[in-house]
Protein backbone atom coordinates (compact mmCIF):
# COMPACT_ATOMS: atom_id res chain seq x y z
CA UNK A 1 0.00 0.00 0.00
CA UNK A 2 2.89 2.36 0.72
CA UNK A 3 4.33 1.63 -2.72
CA UNK A 4 0.93 2.37 -4.23
CA UNK A 5 1.00 5.81 -2.61
CA UNK A 6 4.47 6.64 -3.90
CA UNK A 7 3.73 5.27 -7.37
CA UNK A 8 0.32 6.93 -7.76
CA UNK A 9 1.71 9.45 -10.26
CA UNK A 10 4.13 7.02 -11.91
CA UNK A 11 4.14 7.82 -15.62
CA UNK A 12 4.36 4.33 -17.09
CA UNK A 13 5.65 4.27 -20.66
CA UNK A 14 6.26 0.87 -22.20
CA UNK A 15 7.66 2.05 -25.52
CA UNK A 16 10.86 3.62 -26.77
CA UNK A 17 11.37 7.31 -26.10
CA UNK A 18 14.50 8.71 -27.73
CA UNK A 19 14.17 11.95 -25.77
CA UNK A 20 13.96 10.15 -22.42
CA UNK A 21 15.69 6.74 -22.48
CA UNK A 22 14.77 6.10 -18.84
CA UNK A 23 11.13 5.70 -19.86
CA UNK A 24 11.98 3.10 -22.49
CA UNK A 25 11.55 -0.58 -21.62
CA UNK A 26 9.81 0.28 -18.39
CA UNK A 27 9.26 -3.42 -17.83
CA UNK A 28 12.93 -3.72 -16.90
CA UNK A 29 12.37 -1.60 -13.79
CA UNK A 30 9.90 -1.89 -10.94
CA UNK A 31 6.93 0.29 -11.83
CA UNK A 32 3.39 1.05 -10.74
CA UNK A 33 1.74 -1.96 -12.34
CA UNK A 34 4.56 -4.34 -11.50
CA UNK A 35 4.11 -3.40 -7.84
CA UNK A 36 0.36 -3.97 -8.08
CA UNK A 37 0.84 -7.28 -9.88
CA UNK A 38 3.21 -8.46 -7.18
CA UNK A 39 0.69 -7.42 -4.53
CA UNK A 40 -2.02 -9.44 -6.29
CA UNK A 41 0.27 -12.46 -6.42
CA UNK A 42 1.05 -12.26 -2.70
CA UNK A 43 -2.59 -11.78 -1.71
CA UNK A 44 -3.64 -14.78 -3.79
CA UNK A 45 -0.97 -16.88 -2.11
CA UNK A 46 -2.12 -15.76 1.35
CA UNK A 47 -5.57 -16.97 0.38
CA UNK A 48 -8.01 -15.50 2.91
CA UNK A 49 -11.45 -14.43 1.68
CA UNK A 50 -10.58 -10.73 1.94
CA UNK A 51 -7.19 -11.42 0.35
CA UNK A 52 -8.82 -13.14 -2.62
CA UNK A 53 -11.28 -10.31 -3.11
CA UNK A 54 -8.47 -7.75 -3.09
CA UNK A 55 -6.25 -9.91 -5.33
CA UNK A 56 -9.05 -10.11 -7.88
CA UNK A 57 -9.69 -6.38 -7.73
CA UNK A 58 -6.02 -5.52 -8.22
CA UNK A 59 -5.53 -8.05 -11.02
CA UNK A 60 -8.51 -6.59 -12.89
CA UNK A 61 -7.14 -3.10 -12.34
CA UNK A 62 -3.79 -4.08 -13.86
CA UNK A 63 -5.52 -5.75 -16.81
CA UNK A 64 -7.65 -2.69 -17.47
CA UNK A 65 -5.14 0.08 -16.89
CA UNK A 66 -1.59 -1.11 -17.61
CA UNK A 67 -1.83 -0.48 -21.35
CA UNK A 68 -0.43 -3.89 -22.32
CA UNK A 69 -2.21 -6.59 -24.31
CA UNK A 70 -1.90 -10.35 -24.21
CA UNK A 71 0.60 -11.70 -26.73
CA UNK A 72 -1.05 -13.58 -29.60
CA UNK A 73 2.06 -14.31 -31.66
CA UNK A 74 5.30 -15.41 -29.99
CA UNK A 75 7.26 -16.32 -33.10
CA UNK A 76 9.70 -13.46 -32.40
CA UNK A 77 8.74 -12.63 -28.82
CA UNK A 78 8.99 -16.16 -27.46
CA UNK A 79 9.22 -15.12 -23.77
CA UNK A 80 6.26 -12.75 -24.29
CA UNK A 81 8.23 -9.69 -23.26
CA UNK A 82 5.66 -7.43 -24.94
CA UNK A 83 3.21 -8.21 -22.12
CA UNK A 84 5.81 -8.21 -19.35
CA UNK A 85 5.16 -5.98 -16.36
CA UNK A 86 8.59 -6.55 -14.83
CA UNK A 87 11.65 -8.38 -16.15
CA UNK A 88 15.38 -8.77 -15.75
CA UNK A 89 18.00 -8.55 -18.45
CA UNK A 90 20.91 -10.96 -18.12
CA UNK A 91 23.82 -10.10 -20.41
CA UNK A 92 25.29 -13.60 -20.33
CA UNK A 93 22.07 -15.61 -20.17
CA UNK A 94 22.67 -17.41 -23.46
CA UNK A 95 26.14 -18.50 -22.35
CA UNK A 96 24.90 -19.68 -18.96
CA UNK A 97 22.08 -21.74 -20.48
CA UNK A 98 23.88 -23.00 -23.56
CA UNK A 99 24.43 -26.53 -22.25
CA UNK A 100 20.74 -26.91 -21.34
CA UNK A 101 19.05 -25.13 -24.24
CA UNK A 102 21.16 -26.20 -27.17
CA UNK A 103 19.71 -27.45 -30.44
CA UNK A 104 23.04 -28.03 -32.19
CA UNK A 105 24.35 -31.42 -33.28
CA UNK A 106 27.24 -30.94 -30.84
CA UNK A 107 24.94 -31.32 -27.82
CA UNK A 108 26.79 -33.19 -25.05
CA UNK A 109 23.65 -34.83 -23.71
CA UNK A 110 22.70 -32.23 -21.10
CA UNK A 111 20.25 -30.34 -23.33
CA UNK A 112 16.65 -30.35 -22.08
CA UNK A 113 14.76 -32.18 -24.80
CA UNK A 114 11.23 -33.43 -24.20
CA UNK A 115 9.41 -36.14 -26.10
CA UNK A 116 6.53 -35.23 -28.41
CA UNK A 117 4.22 -37.41 -26.31
CA UNK A 118 5.06 -35.54 -23.11
CA UNK A 119 4.62 -32.16 -24.81
CA UNK A 120 1.27 -33.15 -26.29
CA UNK A 121 0.03 -34.15 -22.86
CA UNK A 122 1.33 -31.02 -21.15
CA UNK A 123 -0.35 -28.70 -23.65
CA UNK A 124 -3.58 -30.70 -24.10
CA UNK A 125 -2.82 -31.48 -27.72
CA UNK A 126 -3.98 -35.08 -27.40
CA UNK A 127 -7.53 -33.81 -26.82
CA UNK A 128 -7.14 -31.28 -29.69
CA UNK A 129 -7.61 -28.35 -27.28
CA UNK A 130 -4.03 -27.14 -27.59
CA UNK A 131 -3.22 -28.00 -31.17
CA UNK A 132 -2.99 -24.30 -32.17
CA UNK A 133 -1.72 -23.04 -28.82
CA UNK A 134 1.26 -20.73 -29.46
CA UNK A 135 2.82 -21.98 -26.24
CA UNK A 136 3.08 -25.37 -27.96
CA UNK A 137 3.22 -24.88 -31.74
CA UNK A 138 6.50 -25.77 -33.43
CA UNK A 139 8.48 -22.65 -34.23
CA UNK A 140 6.50 -20.70 -31.63
CA UNK A 141 6.50 -22.27 -28.17
CA UNK A 142 8.60 -25.29 -29.04
CA UNK A 143 11.51 -26.10 -31.32
CA UNK A 144 11.19 -29.34 -33.28
CA UNK A 145 14.49 -31.20 -33.16
CA UNK A 146 13.29 -34.21 -35.12
CA UNK A 147 14.57 -37.45 -33.62
CA UNK A 148 16.08 -35.56 -30.66
CA UNK A 149 12.67 -34.36 -29.53
CA UNK A 150 11.22 -30.93 -28.73
CA UNK A 151 12.70 -28.03 -26.79
CA UNK A 152 11.22 -24.94 -25.17
CA UNK A 153 12.20 -21.86 -27.20
CA UNK A 154 12.04 -19.38 -24.30
CA UNK A 155 15.74 -19.63 -23.57
CA UNK A 156 17.15 -20.30 -27.03
CA UNK A 157 19.49 -17.66 -28.52
CA UNK A 158 17.92 -14.96 -30.69
CA UNK A 159 19.38 -12.24 -32.88
CA UNK A 160 16.47 -9.90 -32.16
CA UNK A 161 17.99 -7.43 -29.68
CA UNK A 162 14.55 -6.33 -28.42
CA UNK A 163 13.81 -9.79 -27.05
CA UNK A 164 17.37 -10.97 -26.46
CA UNK A 165 18.27 -12.32 -22.99
CA UNK A 166 15.12 -11.04 -21.29
CA UNK A 167 13.89 -12.90 -18.22
CA UNK A 168 10.25 -11.98 -17.46
CA UNK A 169 9.30 -12.09 -13.77
CA UNK A 170 5.68 -10.92 -13.93
CA UNK A 171 3.55 -10.98 -17.08
CA UNK A 172 0.06 -9.81 -17.86
CA UNK A 173 -1.07 -13.39 -18.44
CA UNK A 174 -0.63 -14.11 -14.74
CA UNK A 175 -3.09 -11.35 -13.91
CA UNK A 176 -5.76 -13.16 -15.93
CA UNK A 177 -5.07 -16.34 -13.99
CA UNK A 178 -5.25 -14.49 -10.67
CA UNK A 179 -8.47 -12.72 -11.68
CA UNK A 180 -10.02 -16.04 -12.72
CA UNK A 181 -9.09 -17.85 -9.52
CA UNK A 182 -9.92 -14.98 -7.17
CA UNK A 183 -13.30 -14.12 -8.70
CA UNK A 184 -14.38 -17.47 -10.14
CA UNK A 185 -15.07 -15.78 -13.49
CA UNK A 186 -14.16 -18.18 -16.31
CA UNK A 187 -14.10 -15.30 -18.80
CA UNK A 188 -10.57 -14.42 -17.67
CA UNK A 189 -9.37 -17.97 -18.28
CA UNK A 190 -11.03 -18.03 -21.69
CA UNK A 191 -9.58 -14.65 -22.66
CA UNK A 192 -6.09 -15.96 -21.88
CA UNK A 193 -6.65 -19.26 -23.68
CA UNK A 194 -8.12 -17.54 -26.74
CA UNK A 195 -5.19 -15.11 -26.93
CA UNK A 196 -2.80 -18.07 -26.88
CA UNK A 197 -4.58 -19.67 -29.82
CA UNK A 198 -7.10 -22.02 -28.21
CA UNK A 199 -10.40 -21.90 -30.08
CA UNK A 200 -13.48 -20.48 -28.36
CA UNK A 201 -15.06 -23.86 -29.14
CA UNK A 202 -13.16 -25.10 -26.10
CA UNK A 203 -14.16 -22.25 -23.78
CA UNK A 204 -14.62 -23.23 -20.14
CA UNK A 205 -17.86 -22.76 -18.23
CA UNK A 206 -16.30 -22.61 -14.77
CA UNK A 207 -13.00 -22.11 -12.99
CA UNK A 208 -11.87 -25.40 -11.50
CA UNK A 209 -8.61 -26.45 -9.90
CA UNK A 210 -8.03 -28.80 -12.83
CA UNK A 211 -8.48 -25.98 -15.34
CA UNK A 212 -6.18 -23.67 -13.38
CA UNK A 213 -3.58 -26.42 -13.11
CA UNK A 214 -3.57 -26.89 -16.88
CA UNK A 215 -3.26 -23.17 -17.63
CA UNK A 216 -0.52 -22.55 -15.06
CA UNK A 217 1.38 -25.55 -16.47
CA UNK A 218 1.15 -24.21 -20.03
CA UNK A 219 1.64 -20.52 -19.25
CA UNK A 220 4.72 -21.07 -17.08
CA UNK A 221 6.25 -24.00 -18.91
CA UNK A 222 9.99 -24.12 -18.07
CA UNK A 223 9.47 -21.36 -15.50
CA UNK A 224 9.08 -21.31 -11.73
CA UNK A 225 5.56 -20.01 -11.05
CA UNK A 226 3.93 -23.38 -11.73
CA UNK A 227 5.79 -24.82 -8.71
CA UNK A 228 4.21 -22.22 -6.45
CA UNK A 229 0.75 -22.97 -7.86
CA UNK A 230 1.24 -26.63 -6.94
CA UNK A 231 2.53 -25.69 -3.49
CA UNK A 232 -0.28 -23.20 -2.84
CA UNK A 233 -2.90 -25.83 -3.69
CA UNK A 234 -1.06 -28.60 -1.80
CA UNK A 235 -1.28 -30.73 -4.94
CA UNK A 236 -0.57 -34.40 -4.25
CA UNK A 237 0.57 -34.98 -7.80
CA UNK A 238 1.18 -33.18 -11.09
CA UNK A 239 1.66 -33.97 -14.76
CA UNK A 240 4.68 -36.26 -15.21
CA UNK A 241 5.14 -36.59 -11.45
CA UNK A 242 7.81 -39.20 -10.61
CA UNK A 243 6.07 -42.55 -9.96
CA UNK A 244 7.58 -42.74 -6.46
CA UNK A 245 5.79 -39.50 -5.52
CA UNK A 246 2.53 -40.03 -7.41
CA UNK A 247 -0.24 -38.99 -5.03
CA UNK A 248 2.27 -38.51 -2.22
CA UNK A 249 3.48 -34.95 -2.66
CA UNK A 250 3.50 -33.18 0.72
CA UNK A 251 4.83 -30.03 2.35
CA UNK A 252 8.22 -31.76 2.60
CA UNK A 253 8.61 -31.83 -1.20
CA UNK A 254 7.45 -28.22 -1.49
CA UNK A 255 10.15 -26.79 0.79
CA UNK A 256 13.61 -26.37 -0.68
CA UNK A 257 16.43 -27.63 1.58
CA UNK A 258 18.91 -25.11 2.94
CA UNK A 259 22.01 -24.72 0.83
CA UNK A 260 25.34 -25.95 2.21
CA UNK A 261 26.59 -22.36 2.51
CA UNK A 262 23.60 -21.37 4.62
CA UNK A 263 24.13 -24.35 6.91
CA UNK A 264 27.82 -23.57 7.29
CA UNK A 265 27.61 -19.79 7.70
CA UNK A 266 24.08 -19.54 9.09
Report residues per predicted region.
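Acidic/polar-rich alpha-helix caps and helix-coil junctions
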Residues: 1-102, 113, 126-266
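Short, cationic low-complexity segments
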Residues: 106-123, 130
Amino acid sequence: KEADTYLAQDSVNWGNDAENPFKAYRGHRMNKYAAKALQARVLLYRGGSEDLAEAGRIAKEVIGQCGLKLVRDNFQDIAMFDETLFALHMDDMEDRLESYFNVSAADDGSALWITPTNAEGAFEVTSSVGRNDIRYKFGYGLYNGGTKGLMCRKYLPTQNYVYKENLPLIRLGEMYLIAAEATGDAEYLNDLRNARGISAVYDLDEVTETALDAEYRKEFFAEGQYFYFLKRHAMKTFYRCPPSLEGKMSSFQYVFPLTDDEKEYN
